Amino acid sequence: MSRRPAGTLSAIENEAIQEIRALRASPGEGIHASLLETPARMARHFILGSHGNVQLRLATIAQELGVEMRTLERMFFDEYDQTMAEFQLETRLAFSKSLLCIFPPTKISAVAAILGYNVVQDFNRFFKKQTHKSPSEWSREEHARIASGEAQRSRD
């Protein structure tokens, strides 16, 4: 993944900042109001909304929320019992697996791009580190598993 120059925000970070500002301007009720209750909830919201995109730098979110990164990390851990980095990885992996399960299969380069990787090999490395299989190998096995399950159900 290529690095952005310091001070340059990714599109996903700009969207998050605009959403934070819009929520503050008109907090309303319901889910929007609950997001503003704690910075940890807001961070989780953006991680989920971006599917764990690698271009979402959580320090940018912390700064916009007016808290130190370390404070946000502690708040997140206290509320969700895992670090933001762990949650971001978990979210990214789950989303990539869901895209790789689609039939016809989503191209690995498309999955990598959706998750913010500028270089497909970086996504492949991430995926293999998490699953011990390449994305294409995991996808093939998952499609075979799904097909065998469907074949079994049709015989029953």
Located regions from the model:
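Alpha-helical structural segments
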Residues: 90-98, 145
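Alpha-helical bundle regulatory/interaction domains
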Residues: 1-71, 77-83, 100-125, 133-156
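Generic hydrophobic, amphipathic alpha-helix propensity
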Residues: 36-40, 88-93
